[in-house]
Amino acid sequence: MAQKFVPEAAELCENSLKKFISLIGTVDKLLVISGAGISTESGIPDYRSKDVGLYARIAHKPIYFQDYMRSNRCRQRYWSRNFLAWPRFGQAAPNINHYALSKWEASDRFQWLITQNVDGLHLKAGSKMVTELHGSALQVKCTTCDYIESRQTYQDRLDYANPGFKEEHVAPGELAPDGDIILPLGTEKGFQIPECPSCGGLMKTDVTFFGENVNMDKVNFCYEKVNECDGILSLGTSLAVLSGFRFIHHANMKKKPIFIVNIGPTRADHMATMKLDYKISDVLKEM
């Protein structure tokens, strides 16, 4: 099942791999940026990969922050889908890539990890030197008072508020990298959304929605890490979204080496010191 979402990679060339590893070996302080491609081997699809990415398989339309905040029907649509997807998304396990990066923390040459993912798999693998740039789908936050609870706790509250819903809709659709699934229109009708137990406000998964600004404290912290590093390794991201690409661009402006492992083109290919179109695990297990 996990391999279903791993795109077809270029044939592994030992000489290219050795050169790549040798070049990275010259970097004293390495900053790593990870994207959805690092989690495809855990059975979570990415967005843009050819043939197997979410956008290649279905007409996925993400919910925008402004729509979520102003429309109860939009919130019903979001939470009914998220409710049915959670058992599968919440049980996703780290793969060899997450564990490899967790072990890198023991090295003085590893500086920090910035992940664009919201699946929490880096933390599940034991990583501590990590910034979840877009937040975490493993917790839910009040949009008014900042009350936070675990996603599983909120799942229990959703289940209590919607008896029989998951039994009636037993076949979840395609899973998205943010824990969303696709359901027929109208499925959400009547779905009840528990409010904040502290202030009665709207609850929302603690992730950055489309149309919502990334937390600037996180952004500034990540810029500091880029300034401090001697080079960047980008893993499993096309860098199509500005929130991650800006750090690569900043490093490039400072003439820092950039290394990329991604199956398919990225927005920063022309900036790369070297790029490999290989499966991430095939590279990391040799490093």
From Swiss-Prot:
Keywords: Metal-binding, Mitochondrion, NAD, Transferase, Zinc. Its EC number is 2.3.1.286. Ubiquitously expressed with high expression in the pharynx, body wall muscles and gonad. The keyword Transferase applies. Residues 10-287 form the Deacetylase sirtuin-type domain. Binds 1 zinc ion per subunit. GO terms for molecular function: histone deacetylase activity, NAD-dependent; NAD+ binding; zinc ion binding. PANTHER family: NAD-DEPENDENT PROTEIN DEACYLASE SIRTUIN-5, MITOCHONDRIAL-RELATED (PTHR11085:SF10). HAMAP family: Sirtuin_ClassII. This is NAD-dependent protein deacylase sir-2.2. The gene is sir-2.2.
